[in-house]
Each structure stands twice: as structure tokens, then as C-alpha cells.
Amino acid sequence: MSEAQHAPEGQVIEGRYRVVSRIADGGMATVYQAVDERLGRTVAIKIMHTQLAQGPQRDQFVERFHREARSAAAIANPHIVQVYDTGEFDGLDYLVMEYVHGVNLRYEMNQQGTFSVRETLRIIGETLDGLASAHRA
């Protein structure tokens, strides 16, 4: 089954997270926008790809996935996405994260072309602040 079949729009994961739409596909997982019905907030759910979760190196990928979740959860910084929860859904590990509305930097760069010096310094400063927090965690 494809990842889209594991979390179709409208389906509720673990009786709590109602999937709204697919946001993006990554190397290890697909990310969906969802609503945490218990707390009434929008979240992002990252669900591991089926071929990794059921493949011969499953244990390694699952450990890497959980290590990523633990590492991110240890960081408290406004420039790093917060991790709220982890679990398993239809045999696939998932992690629930803060949902950040908007576009990514690559998209903005393609649209805008160049940034002012002030905007560039702001972006670099926020990025370095988040990176420093990650190194301290």
C-alpha cells in the first residue's frame, strides 16, 4: 500500500489526529497536515514510508526515526519545530510535530530571487540560533 492509503484525508489516527491533507514526501516519511482533535490544534504528522517500515533494514530505520524524534523533542527554540508525540499506525511509526504554516525558504527564494541585506541577516540569524540550540541539546 502507498503512504496515501495509510493516512487518507479524513481518517483519524489513534482516535486523536484527523488527517487533512498531504504536505510533502521525504526520504523516510510522508508528512501530512492534521488536526489534534483532543487539543484542537493543527499539527503535522510524519508517517514512515511502508518500504522502510517493512523492509529488511526495518529496525535501523525505526531507530533512526525515533532518534530524530527524541533529538528534536529535546530542543526548545522558536526556530526549531516542536515534537509533540510519537506512535504507530497500521504498522508504521509516526511522529506528531508543530505545524508551521507558510512556504519554505527555497520557494521564497525562487519567487523573490534575492533578499535585502537586512532580510538575509535575519534569516541567517534565526537559522544559526536554531542550530546553536540543536548543538546544545
Language-model-detected regions and their locations in the chain:
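Conserved ATP-binding/catalytic core of the eukaryotic-like protein kinase fold
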Residues: 1-137
